[in-house]
């Protein structure tokens, strides 16, 4: 069972239509779930000092890397996933990420909205497949530099 479903059942959360959420709300939850995934991967890779773990995680969750992720997996997205990404990317954000261009920030917001939507629609396997694919493409690009 998906983590979202377990949380929903345990905490007796009401059923809501995910499409009623604003794209920035999807991005908010997507940011959190993506961070959990990245932290899980990094902690599993090596038992290191927490500050080194944090630095490694921060590099993968920053707006620029999230923008690279979505570009890496763009051709793998379904029409619906692409539409969710675009809703997030085009949302009018009040704030701007520190150390990020507006372009990267908006693109990353789209990526986070997609992650949030996949999580909230119990599509965690799909979410993980896209994250794995994106990370492997980014790593290959880094290695070829």
Regions found by a protein language model. Name each.
Residues 1-145:
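Double-stranded RNA-binding/processing signature
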């Amino acid at each position: 069972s998906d983590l979202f479903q377990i949380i929903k059942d345990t905490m007796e959360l009401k059923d809501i239509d995910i499409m009623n959420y604003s794209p920035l709300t999807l991005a908010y939850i997507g940011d959190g779930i993506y961070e959990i995934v990245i932290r899980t991967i990094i902690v599993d890779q090596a038992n290191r000092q927490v500050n080194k773990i944090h630095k490694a995680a921060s590099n993968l969750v920053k707006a620029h890397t999230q923008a690279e992720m979505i570009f890496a997996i763009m051709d793998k997205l379904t029409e619906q996933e692409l539409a969710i990404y675009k809703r997030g990317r085009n949302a009018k954000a009040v704030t701007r990420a520190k150390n990020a261009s507006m372009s990267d920030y908006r693109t990353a917001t789209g990526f986070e909205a997609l992650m949030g939507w996949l999580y909230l629609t119990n599509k965690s396997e799909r979410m993980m497949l896209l994250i794995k694919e994106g990370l492997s493409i980014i790593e290959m690009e880094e290695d070829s530099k």
